[in-house]
């Protein structure tokens, strides 16, 4: 840690961030007007510290849950509809069908029925048509879209505990465009708690009918979106982008008032020390994360896409830091090229060795299709031993606290000491990303990840498909990357050329590893495997014979895309070394 880093970290205080946490703990931020009020409160806090802020006002598409219930006979059960369920205030009635789900995938966004269900795969479709399906877990978009495709008229997700969790059931990322609209959910979806769910499962076993009622407020809403731009001195056009969602379910303290507070303190400290920044730092707080499936960050990615393409060196997602008992960093989200940078920051602040985790198709990772090196989504979390001791099931925020997405995500979920630690981790990693002479990325690590992925796919495919061209293209890029980093170390490759290459490589290598859709579009909100254009190779061995020819055709085209990407990346390296 250098002197500037030590000095800036020493200025971190909990005064401003904890005040915001306490205020937001009394301010629900899920209805559109309440989110705008939360933004006004944040803008006032920034103003008190002299931090200038621009407030944008996009119109984004939201679906706000108002009411839900499940009825069987004369018995009524409390329920919550996820965002983007259809609204059926008069209810929809059908026979109940229970499908056992795999407890290991209850928080997965997969659409693979063999991974989701315990009693079969695609052959279950015939049983689903015209039924209201009851399943354990959450109303995940992949599962709900699959059941809709199979003809279900409704879904009841039986949450694992005594509380009901809010969520969303759409696979559409952000506000829909015309191409997305066919995937807009067309069935009623609700969640119930576990005790009630067991009664509903018993009713399904008796062949009973159920009625699902949902009431939603849906449409286009003008939402405030605050952005702080702290200009660097040496290379002000290039920027590190830090962001997180301001809207939450209910008061949402651990998810995500603590994240909003973290970014407030980062803005305060970095603005005060702006003369020490080489590159710029931009910070944004999102509306539409919860009720718009990341609609705020998606709008911003669309509206400023060309600026991101030309100038963004990293995106850093700040979600659920500073929660009680979250003292472990064993599930830290990071792409391979930023892994060493992230792990070093965690080690320098905490003395703990973190463990990296591939980014999910979740959070506000709305920038993958542009191609931005990315890290963090969730940072600190509860140690696995403590989670097991408490009997907690897996959730996707609040540091592992099962208050996530419930009314119980209140002030007790935040922890001052852990919040201070997480603020410093976010601040140090951002500061280094802005100030390192050469961007702290190792694309050789990404190439090694690609190599492991291709080997796994080739092993699964066996003799059915040859990935040798992909291996060769990757090998050529890997050799070029070795020369690039040797040139950077020796000074043969100048810093400006090196940084341009390290940034431009993300525009090629991030999309090929995380997206199926073209650049400047958005992939669906369900699981995307590594190197998705080659991923069909892993399915060949179990694929019905009638589909193998089609799969090989897809793989041929996918391998072409991969090899072309490797060639393009190699060209970026060659230009830097010219």
Which role fits each region the language model picked out?
Residues 142, 222-225, 248-337, 441-444:
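Acidic/histidine-rich catalytic neighborhood of metal-dependent amide-processing enzymes
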Residues 443, 450-578:
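Mature extracytoplasmic or organellar-lumen-exposed domains after removal of signal/transit peptides
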Residues 2-15, 19-127:
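Noncatalytic luminal/extracellular "stalk/propeptide" segments of secretory-pathway proteins
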Residues 83-182, 186, 353:
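Extracellular/luminal Protease-associated
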Residues 87-117, 175-254, 264-275, 280:
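Soluble metallo-hydrolase cores and metallopeptidase-like ectodomains found primarily
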Residues 5-11, 25-34, 83, 130-138, ...:
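Second-shell loop/turn segments in exported
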Residues 282, 384-449, 539-578:
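His/Asp/Glu-rich mid-to-C-terminal helical/loop segments that flank catalytic regions of hydrolases
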Residues 12, 189, 197, 235, ...:
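Metal-dependent peptidase/peptidase-like ectodomains
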């Amino acid at each position: 840690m250098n002197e500037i880093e030590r000095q800036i970290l020493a200025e971190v205080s909990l005064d401003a961030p904890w005040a915001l946490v306490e205020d937001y703990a009394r301010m629900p931020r899920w209805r559109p007007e309440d989110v705008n009020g939360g933004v006004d409160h944040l803008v006032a806090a920034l103003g008190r510290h002299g931090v200038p802020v621009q407030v944008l006002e996009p119109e984004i598409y939201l679906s706000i849950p108002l009411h839900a219930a499940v009825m069987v006979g004369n018995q009524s059960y409390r329920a919550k509809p996820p965002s983007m369920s259809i609204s059926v205030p008069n209810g929809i009635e059908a026979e109940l069908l229970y499908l056992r789900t795999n407890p290991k995938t209850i928080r997965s966004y997969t659409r693979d029925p063999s991974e989701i269900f315990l009693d079969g795969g695609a052959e279950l479709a015939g049983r689903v048509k015209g039924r209201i399906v009851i399943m354990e877990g959450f109303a995940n978009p992949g599962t709900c879209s699959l059941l809709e495709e199979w003809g279900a008229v409704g879904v009841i997700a039986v949450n694992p505990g005594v509380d009901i969790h809010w969520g969303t059931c759409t696979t559409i990322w952000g506000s829909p465009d015309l191409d997305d609209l066919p995937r807009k959910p067309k069935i009623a979806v609700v969640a119930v708690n576990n005790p009630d769910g067991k009664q509903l499962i018993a009713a399904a076993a008796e062949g009973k009918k159920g009625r699902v009622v949902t009431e939603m407020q849906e449409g286009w809403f003008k939402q405030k979106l605050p952005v702080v731009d702290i200009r660097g001195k040496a290379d002000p056009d290039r920027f590190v982008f830090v962001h997180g969602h301001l809207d939450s379910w209910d008061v949402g303290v651990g998810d995500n008032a603590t994240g909003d507070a973290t970014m407030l303190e980062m803005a305060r400290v970095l603005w005060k020390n702006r003369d020490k920044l080489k590159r710029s730092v931009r910070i944004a707080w999102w509306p539409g994360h919860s009720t718009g499936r990341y609609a705020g960050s998606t709008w911003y990615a669309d509206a400023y896409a060309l600026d991101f393409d030309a100038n963004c060196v990293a995106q850093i997602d700040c979600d659920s830091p500073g929660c009680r008992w979250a003292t472990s960093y064993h599930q830290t989200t990071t792409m391979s090229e930023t892994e060493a940078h992230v792990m070093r920051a965690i080690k320098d602040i905490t003395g703990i060795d973190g463990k990296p985790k591939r980014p999910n198709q979740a959070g506000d990772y709305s920038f993958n299709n542009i191609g931005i090196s990315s890290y963090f989504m969730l940072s600190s979390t509860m140690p696995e031993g403590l989670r097991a001791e408490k009997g907690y099931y897996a959730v996707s925020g609040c540091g592992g606290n099962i208050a996530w997405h419930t009314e119980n995500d209140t002030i007790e979920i935040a922890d001052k000491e852990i919040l201070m630690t997480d603020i410093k981790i976010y601040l140090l990693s951002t500061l280094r990303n802005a100030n390192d002479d050469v961007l702290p990325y190792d694309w050789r690590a990404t190439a090694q990840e690609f190599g492991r992925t291709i080997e796994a796919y080739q092993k699964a495919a066996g003799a059915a498909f040859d990935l040798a061209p992909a291996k060769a293209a990757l090998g050529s890029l890997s050799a070029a990357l070795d020369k690039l980093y040797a040139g950077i170390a020796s000074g043969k490759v100048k810093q400006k050329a090196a940084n341009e290459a390290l940034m431009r490589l993300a525009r090629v290598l991030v999309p090929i590893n995380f997206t199926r859709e073209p650049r400047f579009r958005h992939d669906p909100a369900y699981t995307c495997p590594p190197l998705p254009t080659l991923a069909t190779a892993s399915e060949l061995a179990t694929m019905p014979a009638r589909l193998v020819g089609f799969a090989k055709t897809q793989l041929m085209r996918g391998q072409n895309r991969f090899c072309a990407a490797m060639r393009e990346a190699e060209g970026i390296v060659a230009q830097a070394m010219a």
